[in-house]
């Protein structure tokens, strides 16, 4: 893959064993594609086709998108894919190529909560962790966002590129979206280390579509054991 760069955003706050497992799975799925790791704390070099960069602002919802803009400008490929530290990606995810001048979102994903019964849950909602998009279109969207909000966007108004409610509230252009689905799902973990207050308080609810076992990732009760 020479036309895609993955941008890995991390606050370095997840369990050590999980971090090792996540790295192993990510590098396997990327299969040598360029990766930019943007971390809040210094990290040991990963080697290979990996660039390490320290984030230049404290943790916040707005900072997620400010760092994404930095990473998108560092990349030189036609496409970029967001990688988050609590999300697992199948190799197939990074092979997708949404329409140009659209923000792409993989809509085949499961949430897996680290509290309560181990079960996969699905909600029909675009998530930044599953974004794979035309790089220049992402830069255009985020430059407009931060030109309008030079000091950063308020947490209560911050959200994904291409979500109409978010962009209407920010008074910026509502961006075109190209939703796609892979055969194997992305898995996003919901945990008390997250930025979302509902997650930290373990009060966040999952969707009504649920499964105990899914292709490729296996049983929820087995996969959740890696988050430790």
Task: Describe the predicted segments one by one.
Residues 14-21, 54-62, 123:
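Short, flexible/disordered intra-domain loops and linkers
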Residues 80:
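Short aromatic/hydrophobic "clamp" motif used to bind/position activated sugar donors
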Residues 37-76, 93-95:
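Active-site-proximal specificity loops/subdomain of glycosyltransferases
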Residues 20-33:
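Short, acidic, metal-binding catalytic loop of nucleotide-sugar glycosyltransferases
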Residues 1-21:
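N-proximal low-complexity "stem/linker" segments adjacent to membrane-targeting elements
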